[in-house]
Curated annotation (Swiss-Prot):
Gene Ontology terms, MF aspect: 5S rRNA binding; structural constituent of ribosome
One annotated GO biological process: translation
Protein name per its UniProtKB record: Large ribosomal subunit protein uL18
One Pfam family this sequence matches: Ribosomal_L18p
Family: Belongs to the universal ribosomal protein uL18 family.
GO CC list: cytosolic large ribosomal subunit
Function statement: This is one of the proteins that bind and probably mediate the attachment of the 5S RNA into the large ribosomal subunit, where it forms part of the central protuberance.
UniProt source species: Bordetella petrii (strain ATCC BAA-461 / DSM 12804 / CCUG 43448)
Oligomer and partners: Part of the 50S ribosomal subunit; part of the 5S rRNA/L5/L18/L25 subcomplex. Contacts the 5S and 23S rRNAs.
Gene3D superfamilies given in the database record: 3.30.420.100
Record's keyword terms, sorted: Ribonucleoprotein, Ribosomal protein, RNA-binding, rRNA-binding
Length: 121
């Protein structure tokens, strides 16, 4: 079993519980170079809001820093950005789906920034 399969297996119980709650889901994906955050509808069929380190606005803010987006500073910017977009779309309450990643480092930085910017989870 490789790392990706193990991570996806760890994500299953969390996603099952979130689907029972019937609330919007803040799902993240972390690669070596970038971090992505999506808010998915309670039905699970549509992405309502998204933010990542690939967006021009985020990249412009990261231009003076080292790295392209694979660090906690970039994750903090993405967390703030996704929270701002969610509030503009009328979403305040979400369930945090860490996608099997440990709640540490970039994942924690993104979650903390989203909470500070006004998302509740």
């Amino acid at each position: 079993m490789d790392k990706k399969v193990s991570r996806l297996r760890r994500a299953v119980p969390t996603r099952r519980k979130i689907s029972e709650l019937r609330v919007h889901r803040l799902s993240i994906f972390r690669s070596n170079l970038h971090i992505y955050a999506n808010i998915i509808s309670p039905e699970g069929d549509r992405v309502l809001v998204s933010a990542s380190t690939l967006e021009p606005e985020v990249r412009a803010q990261l231009a003076g820093q080292s790295g392209q987006g694979g660090n906690t500073a970039a994750a903090t910017l993405v967390g703030k950005r996704v929270a701002e977009k969610a509030k503009a779309a009328g979403i305040e309450l979400v369930a945090f789906d860490r996608s099997g990643f440990r709640y540490h480092g970039r994942v924690k930085a993104l979650a903390d920034a989203a909470r500070e910017a006004g998302l509740k989870f």
